[in-house]
Amino acid sequence: MKEEKKLLLQEVEEKISASQGFILLRYLGFSAAYSREFRNSLSGVSAEFEVLKKRIFFKAIENSGFEIDSSDTGGHLGVVFAYDDAVSAAKQVLDFNKQHNDSLVFLAGRIDSANLSGKEVEAVAKLPSMKELRQQVVGLLAAPMSQVVGIMGSALSGVISCIDQKTQKN
C-alpha cells in the first residue's frame, strides 16, 4: 500500500474507533451543494459524512474487528460517523433523505455495538427518539391524574352546592 493510502486507512480506523456507530450509505445524484447541506445537517447531531473508497473502508472495518455485509455496495459510497448518538444521526439521515427525493440508500451500519443491515438501520431511524418516548410516558401519566383532579373538583363543587342549597332553605 502506498503511504497516502496507509495514512487514510489509519485515519478511517481512528474515526471508526472514536465513533459510537456508523452508517454506510449509497448516494445518488449528489451535487456539491447537497453534500454541503447534508454535512451541515449532520453537524447538529455530532456526526460527519465522509466519501471513502470501498477498499479502504472495508479494510478499516476488518482491521477494527467488525463485520459488515459488503455484497450490495455498488455505486458511490459514503459513511456517516456518529460521535455522540448513532440513532439521532440515523434519524437525521432519514429526514434529509425524505427532503431530497430519496437520494440516499441505507446499506449497513453499526449502532450500539450491533451490526445492522440497511433495512434495520432505516427501521431504527423510524423509531421514536428518547425525548419523544419520555413525552409519551409523561402524557400517559398526566392524563389519569388530570381526570382524578377533575373528578375531585366536581365532587367538591357538588358538596359546596349541597351546602349552599341547605343554607338557602334555612
Curated annotation (Swiss-Prot):
One example GO MF annotation: large ribosomal subunit rRNA binding
Gene Ontology cellular component list: ribonucleoprotein complex; ribosome
Cited InterPro entries: Ribosomal_uL10 (IPR001790), Ribosomal_uL10-like_sf (IPR043141), Ribosomal_uL10_bac (IPR022973), Ribosomal_uL10_bac_type (IPR047865)
SUPFAM superfamilies linked: Ribosomal protein L10-like (SSF160369)
GO BP term (any one): translation
CDD domains associated with the record: Ribosomal_L10 (cd05797)
Superkingdom: Bacteria
Xref: Pfam families: Ribosomal_L10
Keywords assigned by UniProt, alphabetized: Ribonucleoprotein, Ribosomal protein, RNA-binding, rRNA-binding
Function per UniProt: Forms part of the ribosomal stalk, playing a central role in the interaction of the ribosome with GTP-bound translation factors.
PANTHER family: 39S RIBOSOMAL PROTEIN L10, MITOCHONDRIAL
Assembly, per entry: Part of the ribosomal stalk of the 50S ribosomal subunit. The N-terminus interacts with L11 and the large rRNA to form the base of the stalk. The C-terminus forms an elongated spine to which L12 dimers bind in a sequential fashion forming a multimeric L10(L12)X complex.
Family under the similarity heading: Belongs to the universal ribosomal protein uL10 family.
Protein name: Large ribosomal subunit protein uL10
Species, as recorded: Chlamydia caviae (strain ATCC VR-813 / DSM 19441 / 03DC25 / GPIC) (Chlamydophila caviae)
